[in-house]
């Protein structure tokens, strides 16, 4: 796998991990401040995932994705 594709793959994994962490944090949070924190984490993960998926798809269309 090309280094740029590997970086995109890792970014997708990071976004998935961020979503898992946001879910875990929401389950154990004790105040609204934590709710805001984990909400921002979740929103950021969705934005990051969307960007990384778009870039992965662009690489696939160009025939770069292995």
Describe these PLM feature segments.
Residues 7-10, 14-62:
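Short, charge-rich amphipathic interface segments used for partner binding and complex assembly
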Residues 1-5:
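Short, charged, low-complexity loops and linkers
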């Amino acid at each position: 796998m090309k280094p740029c594709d590997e970086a995109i793959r890792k970014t997708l994994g990071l976004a998935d991990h961020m979503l898992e962490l946001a879910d875990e944090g929401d389950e154990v949070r004790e105040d609204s401040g934590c709710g805001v924190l984990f909400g921002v984490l979740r929103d950021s993960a969705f934005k990051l995932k969307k960007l990384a998926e778009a870039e992965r798809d662009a690489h696939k269309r160009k025939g770069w994705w292995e």
